[in-house]
Design a protein with these regions (language model features):
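Gly-Asp-aromatic-enriched flexible segments
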Residues: 1-93
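Beta-propeller blade signature
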Residues: 84-87, 298-304, 350-355, 401-413, ...
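C-type cytochrome heme c attachment motif
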Residues: 245, 335, 350, 384-385, ...
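Residue-level detector of Asp-centered blade-edge/turn motifs that repeat once per structural unit
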Residues: 254-255, 331-332, 378-380, 432-434, ...
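Hydrophobic beta-strand positions that form the internal "hydrophobic ladder"
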Residues: 259, 336, 383-384, 437, ...
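Short, conserved, GDST-rich strand-edge loop motifs in beta-rich repeat architectures
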Residues: 264-295, 341-342, 346, 385-402, ...
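Multi-bladed beta-propeller domains
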Residues: 308-322, 353-371, 409-424, 459-478, ...
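Solvent-exposed helix-loop boundary motif
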Residues: 310, 580, 657-683, 690-728, ...
Length: 813
């Protein structure tokens, strides 16, 4: 920046008033990797690094008369292009003003442009032409409208040309919406739903059967003329869609006629966003603590008149720019629980009545570093929430994403107790029809962690915690947003997704664990693909490129569901009624907005309250195994082989601590293993023992020489005073125990035989190095050709010489 007298100041020396970048934040004098900025081989001591699309606003204040800059792409980039302009206005701010005044028009334009900044600062019609071309390219047949665009290109008057391009964009976008809706017009599916709804009390079949007949007639006539400007074809298509909508929304399950949901105003990016812009986490491995905490325009809304001109009423809107997450409707149907930030930006769970009154926090806790989110009501008035109470972090990101485990909280006396002691995230606790708690648990220890998010269920006090679906399988990677089907003991609906890639949303699946507990065995159906078999697919980014994308389903019964969805890459996030017959019917969507977490407002039966079984005055739990040889864990192992069990506890990575891939070893586990001791196995394979409660315990069956035959690669946690029992080793959860007297059931529980040296960590230095010292270092002493196996010396990562020399010869997975 140069003044009139010729003096100058470097831009990096002037603080900017406003700065955004397409990735990370604008940086002064360094590139993305914190090295010196280099453009075309030239190093720059002064410079601003800003990833596209970026905007920087500097105060000029009449001091400067000239601005000079060299603009280019940093040499560390693999390629690309750069567009740079200095302006006296901020296009982003102007775009926001336009969006507030004209949301429909700006939203439609934003659907075909990557941001509005370039459009607002381009003096000719090139951006409008590009918008029209982009819109036409999305049509199945764009020839007619391509000719219209060519005619506009010959227009001499610039203002007329710009106006006609924008009018064309609007018309083609409306046609594209019609095209998209027709893709979800499945007459056979409508017939099947109609036949089912006829059986429901309150469905007026006589009223809607003529509409079904009209729909059949129009569908046979066809709608190809919509691409040629045929107004009759367009009218027929709209009429057919109106018939479909009327038939399906007449479903008596919607007679309550009210839906509560979260509404997000997202502006011109509404067609491009994914669910992190609607308050979810930006990945599939973190909890709400890693989601955005501010900068949202979100509210809880109630939608009514669902079959007509939908009415919207605000229930609650945060005043601090927080998102709205984890909506849960109480069984009384008059209030909702949700997650938002407090004034200090920490997450907490709150409640508000649907009439807008009664807003209050549901967890009151004085600890300054605890957060609570993803809560659920319990039938007895208590609540369960996810919390960072363990101060753990996800190991592969060095603890930068905090881990959340479940806590039980009583609003009456403000008492709290931790329920789960898991290595990584718990998600979405929800009450099943039998009063148990269903949730998703991510397991990370000693296994392929891309594919290990398991649906669990337990009693509300944490007892009887067992796998419900997915244990021991690699498909699906993740199952989120599980919700029990009304009237079913164990069936549920959920969203399957990947590990990396698309975050939180994915494919919508109905599960029935009574049919199978792994992979596709218990997957009853994918919605909306009634006739498409579900195939096992072991893939990291499981749902990348998959459409529709679903999130937050709510079952109305076992056939009809409310869900938030984005039907294709260019669609808005809206609310839909979907069913097992493949119908997908939009209830609500709006330009510039996104909707999530739809719940039908109705009173439902409160599940039974399961009394607490824990004995909080005890420090141990009892573990009973009827027959260690039952189940796939020890399949093929001859009876009598297992003589004892070795028990170890996991010590998990703490938040924001070094814990990455090579921190504990090379090709090793993520966690420190703390040896607790051994217990005997009876001749008939039965075992009974006591072990510390509230401790994640893993088990290794040992032979007569103390050698591990198998590895649990998971953990079990007993609550204080609980008797944890199982049939065998990773037995099928659908297997029924055969009543029989076993040796262990007639004995008192065994106490742990402590390991040599007492309870301690299991490490190379303590277990392996003493053997090398006794048997190997006479020759392997670093003096001859034999590699060195002496201990003691460590490198900068803490690895000893013997460990580094030996590890290539030992496969440990």
């Amino acid at each position: 920046l140069i003044k009139a007298d010729g003096t100058a100041v470097w831009l990096d020396e002037v603080p900017y008033e406003y700065g955004v970048a397409g990735w990370a934040k604008p940086k002064m004098n360094t590139n993305a990797y914190d090295h010196e900025i280099v453009i075309a081989g030239k190093e720059y001591k002064h410079g601003v690094f800003c990833h596209a699309n970026g905007t920087l606003v500097y105060p000029v204040g009449g001091q400067y008369v000239r601005f000079e800059a060299e603009v280019g792409i940093d040499d560390t980039s693999s390629g690309g292009s750069v567009f740079f302009q200095a302006l006296n206005t901020v296009p982003t701010f102007v775009a926001e003003e336009l969006n507030n005044k004209y949301p429909e028009e700006i939203g439609m334009l934003g659907a075909v442009l990557d941001g509005l900044d370039t459009w607002l600062i381009t003096p000719d019609a090139s951006v409008e032409k590009q918008a029209a071309d982009n819109a036409i390219a999305r049509l199945k047949d764009g020839a007619y409208y391509s000719n219209v665009a060519k005619q506009i290109a010959n227009e001499k008057d610039l203002n007329t040309q710009i106006r006609k391009y924008l009018e064309l964009v609007e018309k083609v976008q409306e046609l594209y919406t019609l095209q998209s809706d027709l893709e979800w017009l499945n007459v056979e599916a409508v017939k099947l739903a109609f036949a089912d709804m006829k059986k429901q009390k309150g469905y007026d079949a006589a009223k809607y059967e003529p509409m079904l007949n009209e729909l059949v007639r129009l569908e046979k006539k066809g709608f190809k003329g919509i691409y040629n400007g045929d107004e009759q074809a367009i009218a027929d298509a709209k009429k057919a869609l109106e018939c479909k909508r009327a038939i399906l929304l007449a479903n008596p399950l919607l007679d309550a006629d009210k839906i509560v949901a979260a509404r997000f105003k997202v502006g011109s990016k509404a067609h491009q966003i994914m669910t992190p812009s609607l308050g979810t986490q930006a990945n599939n491995w973190s909890n709400q603590e890693s989601a955005g905490r501010e900068g949202f325009d979100a509210e809880i809304v109630e939608l009514s008149n669902l079959r007509g001109d939908i009415q919207m009423r605000q229930v609650y809107k945060p005043k601090n720019g927080s998102s709205i997450a984890d909506l849960k409707l109480h069984w009384d149907g008059d209030r909702v629980m949700f997650t938002q930030t407090q004034d200090d930006k920490r997450w907490n769970i709150y409640e508000v009545n649907l009439d807008g009154t009664g807003f209050k926090p549901l967890v009151e806790n004085d600890e300054p570093d605890l957060e609570f989110y993803d809560g659920t009501y319990l039938p007895d008035g208590r609540v369960i929430a996810i919390s960072n109470i363990g101060y753990q972090g996800v190991p592969c990101v060095n603890g930068s994403d905090a881990v959340g485990n479940m806590v039980l909280y009583d609003p009456k006396d403000k008492s709290m107790r931790r329920l789960t002691f898991d290595q990584d995230a718990n998600w979405n606790p929800v009450i099943m029809n039998n009063g148990r708690v269903m949730y998703t648990r991510w397991e990370y220890t000693d296994l392929t962690h891309y594919y290990s998010r398991i649906v669990m269920h337990m009693n509300p006090d944490g007892t009887e915690n067992k796998a419900l679906y997915g244990s021991g399988a690699m498909f699906p990677n993740s199952t989120f947003d599980v919700q029990p089907l009304p009237g079913h003991g164990s069936a549920f609906v959920g969203i399957i997704s990947g590990h990396h890639g698309v975050a939180r949303s994915g494919r919508m699946i109905i599960f029935d664990p009574t049919k199978g507990r792994k992979s596709t065995a218990g997957m009853v159906q994918e919605i909306p693909h009634r006739n498409r078999p579900i195939k096992e697919e072991i893939k990291d980014q499981l749902v990348n490129g998959v459409w529709p994308q679903f999130i937050k389903p709510t079952p109305l019964n076992d056939k009809y569901f409310l869900v938030a969805a984005k039907l294709d890459p260019h669609a808005l996030w809206g609310l839909y009624l979907v069913d097992v017959y493949d119908n997908v019917t939009c209830l609500m969507q709006a330009e510039g907005e996104g909707y999530i977490s739809p719940i039908l407002v109705r009173k439902t039966k409160t599940p039974p309250s399961i009394p607490d079984r824990v004995k909080l005055n005890e420090k141990e739990a009892t573990f009973f195994i009827q027959d260690i040889y039952e189940g796939e864990g020890l399949k093929g192992i001859p009876r009598g082989t297992v003589k004892s069990l070795r028990l170890h506890a996991y010590e998990y990575a703490y938040v924001k601590t070094r814990s990455d891939h090579n921190w504990h070893g090379i090709q090793s586990g993520w966690d420190i293993k703390r040896m607790l001791g051994t217990v005997p196995v009876e001749e008939d394979g039965s075992v009974i023992f006591k072990a510390p409660a509230n401790t994640p315990i893993s088990i290794q069956p040992l032979d007569k020489d103390g050698v591990a035959i198998q590895w649990m690669r998971s953990w079990v946690t007993g609550q204080p005073g609980e008797v944890v029992s199982c049939i065998g080793c990773h037995e099928d959860q659908n297997q029924i125990a055969i009543p029989k007297r076993v040796i262990a059931s007639q004995k008192a529980p065994s106490a742990l035989t402590l390991p040599e040296g007492g309870t301690r960590s299991f490490t190379f230095d303590l277990e392996v190095q003493p053997i090398l010292d006794r048997a190997c270092i006479a020759c392997h002493n670093g003096e001859g050709k034999a590699f060195d196996l002496r201990g003691g010396k460590k490198d900068k990562l803490g690895y000893g010489t013997s460990y580094l020399n030996l590890h290539p010869y030992v496969h440990r997975q």
